[in-house]
Amino acid sequence: MAPSRLQLGLRAAYSGFSSVAGFSIFFVWTVVYRQPGTAAMGGLAGVLALWVLVTHVMYMQDYWRTWLRGLRGFFFVGALFSAVSVSAFCTFLALAITQHQSLKDPNSYYLSCVWSFISFKWAFLLSLYAHRYRADFADISILSDF
């Protein structure tokens, strides 16, 4: 079932806001706190949110109808970065526990765990929307063949 224009607009707005938030986390944790783990995962979350935004905009413009192979690529990219985000989450959690870091410290690896989870969320949403939009357009292309 195709999403309504309102749903697409809300999804696009949320993705756009989250991409700005991810990029701002990248710059703040790179320049101010000098914590590369949190900066990298915040930047990855911003890039993935931007990718989800592009997916929604291309769906609204009906671009995917002619390029279903691109949606398959988006699906696999989302799956790849889901695995990367989960492994980063486990790594940062293990580092934070073994180094006995504080939950309140902005330089701790616990904050990197949070942004790893947010990156996982956006990678999962990229795969989910690519799968749904591909299924939606695949149904339409099957009907147009007859």
From Swiss-Prot:
Heme transporter that regulates intracellular heme availability through the endosomal or lysosomal compartment. In macrophages of the reticuloendothelial system, is the heme transporter for heme-iron recycling. Essential for macrophage iron homeostasis, transports heme from the phagolysosome to the cytoplasm during erythrophagocytosis (EP). This is Heme transporter HRG1. It holds the Pfam family HRG. It catalyses: heme b(in) = heme b(out). The keyword Transport applies. Strongly expressed in macrophages of the reticuloendothelial system. Belongs to the HRG family. One of its GO terms (cellular component) is endosome membrane. One of its GO terms (biological process) is heme metabolic process. A motif (Di-leucine motif) lies at residues 142-143. Keywords: Cytoplasmic vesicle, Endosome, Lysosome, Membrane, Transmembrane, Transmembrane helix, Transport.
